[in-house]
Amino acid sequence: MPELPEVETTLRGIAPHIEGKTVEAVVLRQLKLRWQINPDLGEILSGRQVLSCGRRAKYLIVRFQTGILLIHLGMSGSLRIFTPSDGRIGRSDRHDHVDIVFSDGTVMRYRDPRKFGAILWYEGIEEHHPLLEKLGPEPLSEAFCTDYLYVRLKAQKRAVKLALMDNAVVVGVGNIYANESLFRAGISPHRPANRLKKKECALLVETVKAVLRRAIETGGSTLRDFVDSDGKSGYFQQEYTVYGRHNQPCPQCGGLVVKETLGQRGTFYCPNCQK
């Protein structure tokens, strides 16, 4: 599933190509994603100019004068940009579900083999959208700080990894990056969240930010389907320390990385280095 770095990579790829441009048409090949696409989306968007693009948690936001297009990549989605000079614009396959065509010939194509993503039109206040209004702070923002995390975790007895992946606590820290951040902070994913000392919260905030920044720099992780707006894979997976490395040597102590299930998600850690 694309996590925050992959969504941010996508945002940075599409924004320069569509901001300020006017939608000419929308081609809908498949309406049934996680939530059904409005069949009138083409009529709604035609003639509207894109004011800006943004991201909140794992949601991409395309802003217009009187509404927003909220896009979630689901388990396997991606957005590709095709320009008039690209001979592949007309070539689509069964996984290419939506094309947004701009007046200059640019096409933004939504591809989703597993059809678990979403493209939603909303004309209310952005922050009040039901999918956005209860989200926690962005992990790369100043709001996600030591004091904030320490207070939030003090009231929680569940495992720290589960708390870290809760979008009400902090957004966008999915399974891959939770595993990697906890390893680099030396904290066991099983530790009760309310047992973390303040200095450990400070270290965890630092490692979460560092891991996410590095992942964005490397274009995110490509394990199966993810590609950026140019169709290129990310390569942060080459820098994994524990994720996906079950029974392989820990890069710090040489002991074996363990895989367990926590909250129905694969959890990778080093029992020697993480306490």
UniProtKB/Swiss-Prot annotation:
The family this protein is said to belong to: Belongs to the FPG family.
**Matches recorded under NCBIfam families:** fpg, PRK01103.1
Q: Which GO terms describe its biological process?
A: base-excision repair
Q: How is the cofactor bound?
A: Binds 1 zinc ion per subunit.
**What residues bind DNA, as annotated?**
H95, R114
Q: Which E.C. number(s) belong to this protein?
A: 3.2.2.23, 4.2.99.18
Supply the Gene3D superfamilies for this chain. Answer: 1.10.8.50, MutM-like, N-terminal (3.20.190.10)
Which CDD domains does the entry link to? EcFpg-like_N
Q: Which PANTHER family match?
A: FORMAMIDOPYRIMIDINE-DNA GLYCOSYLASE
Q: What does this protein do?
A: Involved in base excision repair of DNA damaged by oxidation or by mutagenic agents. Acts as a DNA glycosylase that recognizes and removes damaged bases. Has a preference for oxidized purines, such as 7,8-dihydro-8-oxoguanine (8-oxoG). Has AP (apurinic/apyrimidinic) lyase activity and introduces nicks in the DNA strand. Cleaves the DNA backbone by beta-delta elimination to generate a single-strand break at the site of the removed base with both 3'- and 5'-phosphates.
Q: Which domain of life is it from?
A: Bacteria
Q: Does the keyword Membrane apply?
A: no
InterPro entries xrefs:
DNA_glyclase/AP_lyase_DNA-bd, DNA_glyclase_Znf_dom_DNA_BS, Formamido-pyr_DNA_Glyclase, FPG_cat, MutM-like_N-ter, Ribosomal_uS13-like_H2TH, Znf_DNA_glyclase/AP_lyase, Znf_FPG/IleRS
Q: What is this protein called?
A: Formamidopyrimidine-DNA glycosylase
Which reactions is this enzyme annotated as catalysing?
Hydrolysis of DNA containing ring-opened 7-methylguanine residues, releasing 2,6-diamino-4-hydroxy-5-(N-methyl)formamidopyrimidine; 2'-deoxyribonucleotide-(2'-deoxyribose 5'-phosphate)-2'-deoxyribonucleotide-DNA = a 3'-end 2'-deoxyribonucleotide-(2,3-dehydro-2,3-deoxyribose 5'-phosphate)-DNA + a 5'-end 5'-phospho-2'-deoxyribonucleoside-DNA + H(+)
- Record's keyword terms, sorted: DNA damage, DNA repair, DNA-binding, Glycosidase, Hydrolase, Lyase, Metal-binding, Multifunctional enzyme, Zinc, Zinc-finger
Zinc fingers typed FPG-type, residue spans:
241-275
Q: How does it assemble?
A: Monomer.
Query: Per UniProt, what is one GO molecular function of this protein?
Result: 8-oxo-7,8-dihydroguanine DNA N-glycosylase activity
Q: Which residues form the active site?
A: P2, E3, K58, R265
Report the record's disulfide bonds.
none
